[in-house]
Amino acid sequence: MNKPITPSTYVRCLNVGLIRKLSDFIDPQEGWKKLAVAIKKPSGDDRYNQFHIRRFEALLQTGKSPTSELLFDWGTTNCTVGDLVDLLIQNEFFAPASLLLPDAVPKTANTLPSKEAITVQQKQMPFCDKDRTLMTPVQNLEQSYMPPDSSSPENKSLEVSDTRFHSFSFYELKNVTNNFDERPISVGGNKMGEGGFGVVYKGYVNNTTVAVKKLAAMVDITTEELKQQFDQEIKVMAKCQHENLVELLGFSSDGDDLCLVYVYMPNGSLLDRLSCLDGTPPLSWHMRCKIAQGAANGINFLHENHHIHRDIKSANILLDEAFTAKISDFGLARASEKFAQTVMTSRIVGTTAYMAPEALRGEITPKSDIYSFGVVLLEIITGLPAVDEHREPQLLLDIKEEIEDEEKTIEDYIDKKMNDADSTSVEAMYSVASQCLHEKKNKRPDIKKVQQLLQEMTAS
């Protein structure tokens, strides 16, 4: 006979069936991330850092539950059900808390299961009209996309733009990408790459090269969330046009998959060029400085227009034929009238290796973009990816700690593929990166200050 569950019961003693029920409540919308960042060591420090969270996240690809693994790992510290319930209530997971200790849950708490709540919210999500048009020249943008009206703070700050985007049919995009040929471009196919929310293909429209992003639902992303990101990308692009932001040409919403069509970026992403993908020559230090400044200019334009990108990373910094930096991928961007204030979201999104501590707690603030850009600056200096499980330290941002502890210097990490880097400007860029990576968001510079520091670096 099972023993009754009390506040002093160890979490590690909970049976598998109960853990599975808890996971059913917490796994959706990545609720486990909220718990993970709230768990502390006895010293008060965070028990789980970005790397730990990335490891839990990877379990989704194998069909496993991050919540189950989190509770198993935390359970090894002899935490109790009382500790867990306190954490669940603090994060408003009332339904799973009531499974464990019903009397501990406030009587006024809404214990609607999270999956039900998601369904209710999704039914109310606006989505764009699905217009069909025949193929016309890209420059004749006859079909316009009108962002859905909303009274929410996020959409209030977005005025409807008269910018016109072409509405492609899905059939047309299949034709111009050779039926979305999955073979890489290097072997004669059309596939340029893939990311968290879809695959990008090279296409040709009226003798113009374009990039077609076909959105696809990932393991932890619902179809409705994907539609919402499609919608958001178009809204941001309608509002924000700048030399250092990618240019959206059109979209397709009438077929099996949602698609976005962009101006083609012949030099790919900063991530690819830093890794010299496909045998491309390494970027010079001079070129890297130019790219850093361009990316900062793009982020500044977004922030000036009250938008927070939320997924700044080297893979989302694209390079045109002149290696001009173009910020891309605005599906996660948020807008707010109260831009200077921090707002909260139950949906924690972004790329873990670039995420600021507060972003992992669900806070939305422009200072999180600054933190992510700090990681990008480290990539520019070192030529190393933001995360590598076969490297020590595995997270690139942790080299800051090694340098501060005087175990190493930034010279130890400079990309040896460069031959024109001078120590003064490298140290200046590292200083900017270090400021951007401050644990406390209010101690980080704003993007205007980052721009100024980068300009001073190249002028000196």
Swiss-Prot record:
Residues annotated for ATP binding in this entry: 192-200, 213, 313-316, 329
Result for mutant: I26T: No effect on inhibition of NF-kappa-B activation; no effect on interaction with MYD88
Outcome of mutating R20W: Increases inhibition of NF-kappa-B complex activation; decreases interaction with MYD88; decreases protein stability
Domain Protein kinase as annotated: residue spans: 186-454
A GO CC term assigned to this protein in UniProt: extrinsic component of plasma membrane
Record keywords: Acetylation, ATP-binding, Cytoplasm, Disease variant, Immunity, Innate immunity, Kinase, Magnesium, Nucleotide-binding, Phosphoprotein, Serine/threonine-protein kinase, Transferase
Role of this protein: Serine/threonine-protein kinase that plays a critical role in initiating innate immune response against foreign pathogens. Involved in Toll-like receptor (TLR) and IL-1R signaling pathways. Is rapidly recruited by MYD88 to the receptor-signaling complex upon TLR activation to form the Myddosome together with IRAK2. Phosphorylates initially IRAK1, thus stimulating the kinase activity and intensive autophosphorylation of IRAK1. Phosphorylates E3 ubiquitin ligases Pellino proteins (PELI1, PELI2 and PELI3) to promote pellino-mediated polyubiquitination of IRAK1.
UniProt name for this protein: Interleukin-1 receptor-associated kinase 4
Species per Swiss-Prot/TrEMBL record: Homo sapiens (Human)
Name of the encoding gene: IRAK4
